[in-house]
UniProtKB/Swiss-Prot annotation:
Upper lineage: Eukaryota, Metazoa, Ecdysozoa, Arthropoda, Chelicerata
Disulfide feature: C35-C49, C42-C55, C46-C82, C48-C65, C57-C63
Other noteworthy facts: Negative results: does not affect the currents in rat brain Nav1.2/SCN2A or skeletal muscle Nav1.4/SCN4A sodium channels.
Purpose of the protein: This neurotoxin binds at site 3 of insect voltage-activated sodium channels (Nav) and prolongs evoked axonal action potentials by a slowing down of sodium current inactivation. The toxin also inhibits glutamate uptake from rat brain synaptosomes. It reversibly inhibits the N-methyl-D-aspartate (NMDA)-subtype of ionotropic glutamate receptor (GRIN). In addition, the toxin shows antinociceptive effect in all rat pain models tested (inflammatory, neuropathic and nociceptive).
Name by which UniProt lists this protein: Delta-ctenitoxin-Pn1a
Species: Phoneutria nigriventer (Brazilian armed spider)
Keyword Secreted: yes
Family: Belongs to the neurotoxin 03 (Tx2) family. 05 subfamily.
GO molecular function terms listed in the Swiss-Prot or TrEMBL record: sodium channel regulator activity; toxin activity
Cellular location(s): Secreted
Proregion span(s): 17-34
Record's signal peptide: 1-16
Amino acid sequence: MKVAIVFLSLLVLAFASESIEENREEFPVEESARCGDINAACKEDCDCCGYTTACDCYWSKSCKCREAAIVIYTAPKKKLTC
């Protein structure tokens, strides 16, 4: 009886892991591929990952993703526009 339960558990685990692999193949593009991390090049706030980062073009010649100084303003703005 115990052997049958272990066998069925392994069978269910095998089917579950197969299902997860199929889902990964359906959606190959991850969130990290669509947005930039800190210090990544950007053109607008939506190019930066997370709600606390913004595209900063003010202090440097090239625009880069930086932590926002005013998160209370940046987070709702990114939720509405991105």
